[in-house]
UniProtKB/Swiss-Prot annotation:
The species this protein was found in: Listeria monocytogenes serotype 4b (strain F2365)
GO BP terms, alphabetized: carbohydrate metabolic process; pentose-phosphate shunt
Entry GO MF terms: aldehyde-lyase activity; transaldolase activity
EC number(s) reported in the record: 2.2.1.2
Alphabetical UniProt keywords: Cytoplasm, Pentose shunt, Schiff base, Transferase
Family: Belongs to the transaldolase family. Type 3B subfamily.
Protein's UniProt name: Probable transaldolase 1
Name of the encoding gene: tal1
Length: 214
């Protein structure tokens, strides 16, 4: 399973990229707005840092407008992926963009049927949301497993991006469930990096080394 970072914060992206474990970036209008910067400026800076898929999301709701927006996003950089909401209009846009050779990421997926429809429309990626399903008492990991099973049975090339990842356990369970990618906030990566036994082990090694020098 590969890792994307879910943020529009350039400093977080730089830190994660320096550690060598991220293969791409996902953004959305909320994350970009949080940075208080121009969308194109942010995305162009991100593409200069990470050599991998960068998802930029449309803000229109009508297919024709999403297609026009998607074409603009795709022209920013060859690594751009157009992120489109899971609606009928969204799938119509996915079909056209796919036919034009533009990669798409269908977001806000909450059921296996939605994922299957998006895949058949030509989506490069589908993004089921774990945390938001957990919030309403559903099991997002069951959804990941169902989508992975269906895609495997029918040889569907669309990749699964586990989104709305809230904690390290989500990450492990996504990997076990068959997700191709987990897009993870920087704060969750920080939690994944740490373990109290690692810290105490380092402290002991250093203490032993200092004692040996005396």
């Amino acid at each position: 399973m590969r890792f994307f970072i879910d943020t529009a914060n350039v400093e977080e992206i730089k830190k994660a990229n320096r550690m060598g474990f991220i293969a791409g970036v996902t953004t959305n209008p909320s994350l970009v707005a949080k940075e208080g910067r121009d969308f194109n400026e942010v995305i162009q800076e991100i593409t200069s840092i990470v050599d991998g898929p960068i998802s930029g999301e449309v803000v229109s709701l009508e297919a024709d407008e999403m297609i026009a927006e998607g074409r603009v996003i795709a022209k920013i950089h060859p690594n751009m992926v157009v992120k489109i909401p899971m609606t009928g209009e969204g799938l119509a846009a996915v079909k056209v963009l796919t036919e034009e050779g533009i990669k798409t990421n269908v977001t806000l997926v909450f059921s296996a049927t939605q994922a299957l429809l998006a895949a058949r429309a030509g989506a490069t990626y589908v993004s089921p949301f774990l945390g938001r399903l957990d919030d309403i008492g559903d099991d997002g990991l069951v959804l990941i497993r169902d989508i992975a099973d269906i895609f495997e049975i029918y040889g569907i090339p669309t990749e699964i991006i586990s989104a709305s990842v809230r904690h390290p356990i989500h990450v492990i369970e996504c990997a076990k469930a068959g997700a191709d990618i987990a897009t993870v906030p920087f704060k969750v990566f920080e939690q994944m990096l740490k373990h109290p036994l690692t810290d105490s082990g380092i402290d002991k090694f250093l203490a032993d080394w200092e004692a040996a020098k005396k």
